[in-house]
Amino acid sequence: EFQQFVQEVDRPVYMALAPSKTVIAERDQLIPSYVASNARTRYAGMIRDFKAAGMTNLSLDQLKLTDYFKTDHHWNIDGAASAYQTITKGMDLRPVMPSKSNRKEGEHAYYGSLARKTTLAYATSGDQLAYYEPAFFKGINVCYDGACDRPVIDESFVQQEGDYVDRYEVFLRGNHGIMSMKEQTKNDRPTILVLKDSFANPVLPFLAKSANLEVVDVRYVPKSFDVSQFAKQKQVDSVLFLHNSNIAGLMKTYENTL
């Protein structure tokens, strides 16, 4: 299916697969030898298969455990920024990095999905959720669900009190089936189709500073949705799969929509 998609879309197709925390822990020999884990082998196999289908791998192997939240499987803003730099380099885009003065930290602790699922019982302390202020992303028009001018960064998610607030939704208010992100004054930039999961959410605001984005999350589109058709309709210049490495569960969905 992926090979057919690469041929049909007739544009460069890239993949940036975030290694899971297990893959990194295994690489850094932090998992005891008596614990059975083949995460790295599976990860390498997946990348091999995607490359065989004609995609270009943008390796994110430089990521460290400190680039991820302790209480969540997602990467934090440092991991997302590192991924953005790798992607822009690999896709020949101009990176636009914020300065340290644009960085903000939520005043409330962030308990990620791993902690919330266990009713916080195992979380000795929460994470600090950092993000870059909305002003840095001014001019990027975000459209989904039939409306535009949506916030790139919605600070209400970091301002709310309560341990069960999903503060990760500060980035684009979470997941949406189809979304576009364009910087109004820049018409000469390439258009990228991004096929993503929630790992992409903190990366997309950065990426929208370098290119116009048409974004699809196949978990939230109708079964009849045709990604190849959508790519042609939007006249995209390239395609980027931006996912975490546990993509196996989505393979069936991709087979139906590509």
Language model region names:
Residues E1-L258:
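Extracellular glycan-modifying ectodomains
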